[in-house]
């Protein structure tokens, strides 16, 4: 049997790696279909896939070129299905127009099974509240919602997304490696925080700096940064302005080196603008695997995990001072227990074993057995 993995962007390669590994282990012939354009770098790149579709380039997240590029990829991906003739299509969403085009393909080829795997909500997850009600954005959203019923299975990457698309089951992300042992090296007299990931337009820099300002009143504070992004220099300057030192590690890929940084830190920041609809972030999985508790503003799944599993603190505009006081005054025993809690959470929901089991249940629903 042939499974086609269809994905437009390079932002989901970790998930694609897990899917390829799973389907290959189940005896499927896997054919990967993607574009030649890096959404992350906004440039053409050498994609490692069986079918690479050339598409229009774009340089802004909100642009006509971006929409036209998505439409072009989706239509060409449907044509690629005619050549591949897959038994199963596992389609990563966004882009939203892929749902429409795969629905057209399924209407013509009744025997094919289709899985839609929603890993982001466009336009809901974009920090553009004042525009989301406009007609172009409604059409963009409807390209997904109107055709989801054509899927035999609809996955969402988190419980929060299910509330928006009104269907589906959760396929949480996983990290395809063993978590390293924790060796916390914390000080009673100093607080160290970590920011991991891209520093872009959806990060709530004012929230982070306001929190750090309050913490620095009571204790010396240090922020470790692992990552880059268009707003990085601005972020660093804002943090320095509130009296907090910054250690810029740039991009770190070595798990051992990353773990050593996490072991120095009391908390990791998982903070985005309130208009962004996200229930779980990849950075939070890295924090979980490393045993690093979080300062969190993400709604849905992560907020609930913080409350139910005691893995960190939920931050909002109204409780910045209160949360800073808690962090500054809490005992080392409380912090160490949170480190155990967050790694236990990871081992419960976010391992490859759990990821594969969820996929197996879906295949049973489709094919029986």
Model-derived regions, located:
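Conserved donor-binding/catalytic core segment of Leloir-type glycosyltransferases
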Residues: 155, 185-203, 208-213, 223-224
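Nucleotide-sugar-dependent
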Residues: 203, 254-261, 266-288, 295-305
């Amino acid at each position: 049997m042939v499974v086609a993995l269809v994905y437009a962007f390079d932002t989901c390669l970790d998930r694609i790696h897990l899917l390829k590994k799973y389907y290959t282990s189940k005896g499927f012939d896997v054919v990967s279909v993607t574009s030649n354009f890096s959404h992350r770098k906004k440039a053409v790149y050498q994609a490692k896939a069986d079918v690479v579709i050339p598409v229009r380039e774009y340089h802004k997240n909100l642009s006509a070129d971006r929409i036209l590029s998505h439409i072009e990829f989706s239509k060409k991906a449907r044509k690629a299905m005619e050549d591949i003739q897959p038994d199963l299509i596992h389609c990563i969403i966004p882009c939203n127009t892929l749902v429409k085009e795969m629905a057209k393909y399924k209407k013509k080829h009744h025997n094919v099974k289709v899985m839609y795997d929603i890993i982001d909500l466009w336009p809901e997850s974009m920090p553009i509240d004042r525009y989301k009600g406009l007609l172009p954005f409604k059409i963009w959203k409807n390209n997904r919602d109107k055709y989801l019923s054509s899927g035999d299975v609809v996955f969402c990457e988190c419980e929060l997304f299910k509330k928006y698309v009104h269907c589906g089951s959760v396929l949480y992300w996983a990290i395809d490696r063993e978590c390293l042992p924790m060796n916390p090296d914390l000080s009673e007299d100093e607080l160290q925080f970590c920011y991991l990931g891209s520093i872009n337009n959806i990060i709530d820099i004012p929230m982070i700096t306001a929190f750090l300002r309050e913490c620095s009143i009571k204790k010396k504070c240090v922020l470790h940064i692992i990552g880059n992004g268009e707003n990085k220099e601005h972020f660093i300057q804002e943090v320095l302005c509130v009296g907090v030192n910054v250690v810029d590690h740039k991009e770190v890929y070595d798990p051992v080196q990353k773990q050593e940084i996490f072991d120095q830190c009391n908390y990791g920041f998982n903070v985005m603008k309130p208009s962004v609809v996200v229930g779980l972030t990849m950075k939070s999985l890295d924090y979980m695997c490393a045993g690093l508790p979080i300062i969190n503003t993400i709604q849905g799944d992560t907020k609930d995990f913080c409350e139910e599993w005691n893995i960190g603190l939920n931050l909002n505009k109204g409780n910045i001072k209160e949360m800073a006081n808690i962090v500054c005054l809490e005992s080392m025993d409380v912090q160490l227990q949170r480190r155990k809690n967050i790694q236990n959470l990871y081992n419960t929901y976010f391992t490859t074993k759990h990821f594969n089991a969820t996929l197996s249940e879906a295949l049973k629903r489709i094919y029986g057995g």
